[in-house]
């Protein structure tokens, strides 16, 4: 998580886990400026280092961003100019500009239960403009339970409510959305396997 930025931890990730077949992504990393005492420079350094690790290992990066769209966009663009890397914007609630920037460098956008919230109209309008072949669905458990389970402790089984809502938003069947997002998952997380 962006608010945890320990250099020693990153070295451990790089040296110990990247070659493990069960290690399928780098992150969650990124920028989180929600808290007043956010150490922005340390977060930026850590985020860039994680992108470098992701690029070198060819593992996707899971990007967390909160109240940091401009810096996230700048880092993603600058780092993509240094070389391609794969990844997704986790629990997307950001601006249309961030969605466009992420999509322009080939990242995926992951949608959580927030999309079902009554006050998420702006988010829904942004998500409608994201190509289906770039969308994933997530829970962000134990937080952000989708309607009709809002207020309860979130769990992976609740992702079906978010997926159903998203399918309706795109005017497709839940079955079709499930097929698309499953394909997207395996296209992004190439080390993942149905066998395990």
Regions found by a protein language model. Name each.
Residues 12, 25, 88, 108-110, ...:
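Conserved beta-strand segments that form the floor/walls of ligand-binding pockets within enzyme
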Residues 105-172:
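Glycine-rich, positively charged active-site loop/lid region within alpha/beta enzyme cores that binds
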Residues 53, 158-196:
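Mid-to-C-terminal alpha-helical segments outside catalytic/metal-binding sites
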Residues 1-13:
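Single conserved hydrophobic/aromatic residue that forms the stacking wall/gate
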Residues 31, 143, 187:
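Active-site micro-motifs of SAM-dependent methyltransferase domains
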Residues 16-105, 125-126, 130, 148-157, ...:
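Divalent metal-binding pocket/active-site signature
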Residues 70-71, 118-119, 183:
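Short secondary-structure capping/turn micro-motifs that flank functional sites
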């Amino acid at each position: 998580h962006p608010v945890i930025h320990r250099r020693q931890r990153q070295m451990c990730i790089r040296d110990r886990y990247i070659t493990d077949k069960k290690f399928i992504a780098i992150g969650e990393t990124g920028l989180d400026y929600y808290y007043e005492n956010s150490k922005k420079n340390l977060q930026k350094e850590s985020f860039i280092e994680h992108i470098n690790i992701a690029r070198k290992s060819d593992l996707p990066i899971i990007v967390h961003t909160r109240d940091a769209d401009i810096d996230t966009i700048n880092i993603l663009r600058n780092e993509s100019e240094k070389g391609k890397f794969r990844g997704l914007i986790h629990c997307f609630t950001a601006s249309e500009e961030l969605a466009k920037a992420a999509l322009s460098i080939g990242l995926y956008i992951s949608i959580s239960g927030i999309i079902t919230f009554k006050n998420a109209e702006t988010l829904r309008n942004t998500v409608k403009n994201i190509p289906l072949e770039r969308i994933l669905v997530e829970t962000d458990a134990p937080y952000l339970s989708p309607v009709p389970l809002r207020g309860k402790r979130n769990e992976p089984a609740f992702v079906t409510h978010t997926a159903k809502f998203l399918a309706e938003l795109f005017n497709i069947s839940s079955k079709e959305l499930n097929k698309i997002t499953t394909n997207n998952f395996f296209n992004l997380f190439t080390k993942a396997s149905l066998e395990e």
